[in-house]
Every structure is written in structure tokens, then in C-alpha cells.
Amino acid sequence: MKQTLLFILLALVGIAPTMGQNALNAKADNIVGTYTGTKNDDRFKARITRQADDTYKAQVFWVENDRDEDGNKILDRKNPDKSLRNTPCDRIVLFSGLQYNKEDQCWDGTKIYDPHRGIRAKMKAWFTKDGRLCIKGTLFGICESVYWQRLP
């Protein structure tokens, strides 16, 4: 009885990562596109592109509230890389070097940048059943997920 229960439990653990996924996770280039998302009540649009080395990069190209109180473009002042602190908020690279993991049918292998906090976290991305792109960031064992909606 214990062996049967253990077998069922192990089988469920093996199936769990694929539950809720859809066909969009089956091909690496399905992630390429334009998305909209929200972070801390700030709406933005980002574009994911395939790079020459077969990895993927996401860059913001529009932010709803991109100006400060004085009308100046908001800059990436919290970036830990001092050379990037003058980057306008609508040009921030959120991640690069993202790789497709064919076995797990997801994208991983890089870090995502959170410009609100000025931190980079290990990331994993996949499409949910309803077609949204789920991006999960993990830092020191703490996880946070955001959902991006593909634009037509």
C-alpha cells in the first residue's frame, strides 16, 4: 500500500509542472512578441525578440506614466549598474539571455530586472492555460509572479 501511494505521489510530482500549460509552450519562438503588463499599478508594454545566439531579450518600449512631477522622463535610477542609471524608463531591458528549456517546455536560464526595486532575480517563464505569459522571479527563495498579456 505504501509503495502504491509513493508511486502515485511521484507520478503527480512529475506531471505537475506540465499541468495548466498549453501548446504555446511547445516551441521556443512562441515567446516572441509584444506584451502588456502591470507592475505596482504602472502599465507598460514590452517586446520580446529572438537574438542571434538563439536566446531571447525583453525591452520596455512604452510606460503609461513615464514622466515625473516636473515633466521629465523617468530614468532607471535604481539600477545597480551605474552606467544604466540614465536609461529612460521606456527603454529598459528587462532580461536578455533567456533560453528555451525544451524538456520542461518553459524559458529560463537568466535573470529578470525589476526597475521598481533595482534588483535582478532568477526567472522562469511559461504560458498559462488562458494564454498569458507567466514570469516568475526568484530571489533568496522568495518568488513573485507577474502576468503579461500578448498584444495583437
PLM feature segments, named:
Residues T4-V13:
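Sec-dependent N-terminal signal peptides
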Residues V13-Q21:
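C-terminal segment of classical bacterial N-terminal signal peptides
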Residues Q21-T34:
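N-terminal helix-cap/turn-to-beta initiation motif at the start of protein domains
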Residues V32, G37-T38, R43-D114, R120-K122:
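Central antiparallel beta-sheet cores of small beta-barrel/beta-sandwich binding domains
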Residues H116-R117, K122-W126, R132-V146:
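Short, exposed beta-strand-loop hairpins at the edges of beta-sheets
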Residues Y147-P152:
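Short beta-strand-to-coil "C-cap" segments at the C-terminal boundary of structured domains/repeats
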